[in-house]
Structure formats: C-alpha cells, structure tokens
A protein has these predicted regions:
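Loop-to-transmembrane alpha-helix initiation sites
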Residues: 18, 66-74, 93-97, 135, ...
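Helix-loop-helix "hairpin" substructures at the membrane interface of multi-pass membrane proteins
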Residues: 25, 136-208
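Transmembrane alpha-helical segments in multi-pass inner-membrane proteins
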Residues: 201-250
C-alpha cells in the first residue's frame, strides 16, 4: 500500500495537489483551533463552518467563485452571533444554535434552487482528490496569510484569549480581536471545505488542538504541536483513503480522532488530572 501511494504521488498530479492542500489545511486549522479551544468557542467553530453553506450554494447560482459567497456568509454569521449575544439576555450557545440552524436551513433551500448536487455534495463532505492547481494555491495563500496574522498579533490574541478583562484594562480592543479571530476562523473553514467538507470542518479545527492541549501549557508549543498533528493526520488520512478507495475527508478526521484517543490515555497532563481526581 505504501509503495502504491508513493508511486501514485510520482505519477498523478491530482494526488500531489491533494497532499499539499491537505498538509496546508492541517497546519493552519491546527493553529487557529488552539485559540478556539482556549476561548471555549468550539460551538462557534461548528456554527461558522456550517454557516458558509448558503454562501457556497448562492455562489453556484450566481456563477461566482464559492470562496466569495462562503466568506461573506461566514463573516455574517459570526457578526450576527456576537451581536445577539452582546445586545440581549440571550446566551452565546442559544445565539449560536439559532444562527446555525437558520443558516443551515437557508443552505438547504439554496441547494435545491442551485440544482448542482454533485458539486455541492463535494462541498458538504469534501473531495480533496478533485482539488485543482488554482484551488491549491488559494489554500496555500489563505493559510499563509492566516498564519502571518497570528504571528504578528500573537501577543494581543494571547492576552484576549486568556484574560479579556485584563486585556480591556490595558487598552486592548477585545472586540476587535474577537472579530479578527472570527475572520480567521471563516477563512480556515472555507479552505477546509476542499478536504473534509462543511460537515467535518470543526473536527479539523478542534481535535488536533485538543490533543495538543493535553501535552503542553505553552500556547506556542500547543500551536506547533497542533499544526504538526493536523498535518500528520491529513497525510495519513489521505494515504488510507486513497489506498482503500474510501472517503479521504472522513479518514483524515478519524485519524485525528485516533491521535486524541491515544493521547487521552497517555498524555502527562491527563494522567496528572486522573491522579488528582483519584486522590479526592
């Protein structure tokens, strides 16, 4: 199987594109996912990843690049969720649930109008083996831009993630960085549609970051480990999916889940926590 996969990489351009794209998505999703984990925003990641669906469907209807529609609707969902939470007594999980279900319902309606089930099926569940050169370079470009923003604004992102009250008292514009993170999350969700589809994007964001969190208390180390695990899961998932002729996106997600399951039992932080619980 390994030999056949390596031969395929040497012979088939589509497999080369798939590998490069999968690694790029694994790295950037792993990095952004760390901030999502630390802020307790896993539900927000799930909501935005599904909220891009009507944008994709509308893009097919209008005949424009689906990146445009997906980004617009992803940002719209994040702004709407934050606005509802900030300007009413409704809690964030309720705001997320309302927005998530509404956007998903709109997406289903637009899918019926678009009448392009094949392409939209790939958007829902991913088809990384169909990634073209243009899509690959867009993914690399978006991923590089997201990572650059994280590096340049690491300190305020770190501060607003761990202690937003302290950050506010120091003059840091907490809301600005919240919306910035939502923009980054939306961009990652759009690019990850290529590999795992809108249904499984949240797993690419959350699982590697959660696994890395079991091993380290340093955000830099967590980001590096999470990105590495995301890339490794993407490589192994692509290998398994291609070799067995099964869904590559699902293989990537399950591989990442296996990493988490193993780490759950062997990670030092997890074992210390179990020891502390058993001593009470």
């Amino acid at each position: 199987m390994i030999t056949e996969f390596i031969d395929g990489l040497q012979q088939f351009h589509f497999l080369q594109n798939a590998l490069i794209t999968a690694i790029a998505i694994g790295i950037v999703a792993g990095a952004v996912g760390c901030f999502i984990i630390l802020r307790g925003m896993s539900l927000m990641g799930d909501a935005i990843s599904h909220a891009v669906l009507p944008g994709v469907a509308l893009s097919f209807i209008l005949g424009i690049n689906f990146f445009i529609g997906a980004i617009v609707f992803g940002l719209l969902a994040s702004v709407l969720i934050t606005y509802i939470k900030s300007n009413s007594i409704i809690k964030s999980d309720t705001a997320i649930g309302i927005t998530f279900s509404s956007f998903l319902a709109l997406g289903v309606i637009l899918i019926g109008v678009a009448k392009s089930s094949t392409d939209l099926f790939h958007i829902l569940f991913g088809n990384i083996l169909a990634v073209q050169d243009r899509d690959m370079w867009i993914t690399i470009g978006v991923g590089a831009a997201v990572l650059l923003v994280i590096v340049l604004l690491f300190r305020p992102l770190l501060l607003t993630s761990f202690d937003p009250v302290l950050a506010q008292s120091m003059g840091v514009r907490v809301k600005v960085y919240h919306y910035l993170l939502m923009v980054l999350l939306t961009l990652v969700s759009v690019t990850a549609m290529q590999s795992v589809g809108t249904i499984l994007i949240v797993a690419m964001l959350i699982t590697p970051a959660a696994t890395a969190y079991l091993y380290t208390n340093s955000l830099w180390s967590m980001m590096l480990l999470s990105s590495g695990l995301g890339a490794l899961a993407s490589i192994l998932g692509l290998f398994i999916g291609y070799s067995l002729n099964i869904a590559v996106g699902s293989c990537i997600v399950l591989t990442s889940a296996v990493f988490f399951l193993i780490s759950f039992f062997i990670a030092p932080k997890q074992r210390k926590n179990e020891h502390a619980l058993s001593s009470h």
